[in-house]
Amino acid sequence: LKFPKLMCSDIEYTLPKPNYTIETLNHLISCQANVSFSLLIGEDNLVNFNKWKEYKNILKLVDLYVYPRKHRNKIPNHLLKHSKINLLDAPKLDFASSDIRKKLKKGEVIKSSIPTSTMAYLEKNNIYK
């Protein structure tokens, strides 16, 4: 793998519903206390991050990495300045993971939207099927 420290998990499907990020993180940390976790979200999610359940506790548990989007959103100043929130310098994409999931569920082709290696991984591991 290109990123050996990244791991895909279906943990959110196995936890009771409704499930919130703070609950997923608490579960992961309790199961793997020796692992350092980070959270990666799209910039579009950072705009409303302060409305997430226990968002301050999320930031106590993990560093937050924010992937940029083509369309700049209005991010609250206190979040931009937070020491645990890291804005990534990466190619700006005009779609979100939710867009990819919707297309996959409809059986639409997404190969032009994501790297070939990512598509191969999704297919090999039956992710989103």
Explain the meaning of each model-derived region.
Residues 1-129:
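Nucleotidyltransferase catalytic core that binds NTPs
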